[in-house]
Amino acid sequence: TDTRNDMRINTEEVFGPVASVIRVRDYEEALQVANDTPFGLSSGICTQSLKHATHFKRNAQAGMVMVNLPTAGVDYHVPFGGAKSSSYGPREQGRYAVEFHTTVKTAYTSA
């Protein structure tokens, strides 16, 4: 608890059972802190404000955005992937799965 945004725990992309708490003054500072990272796999907010929830979904710089939900995992039928330096390449699930798991080839045959 009471970590700062410049601490190593908050500047690296950690995959593990880790929770970090950064105190902020208001929603605007929270969004700024959330976006102040080179990574952007997943981001989330817990709020009762529909205004903040909608604004966060549109402005969080992440490939997946959750409101009042855990930030780990997605349904199998939706695209899974990040933004910025997270999750390079095409999305791994949903309609993007074909692009992720195949190589497109154009071929012609003359009869």
Positions of the model-derived regions?
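Conserved C-terminal structural/oligomerization subdomain of aldehyde/semialdehyde dehydrogenase
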Residues: T1-A111
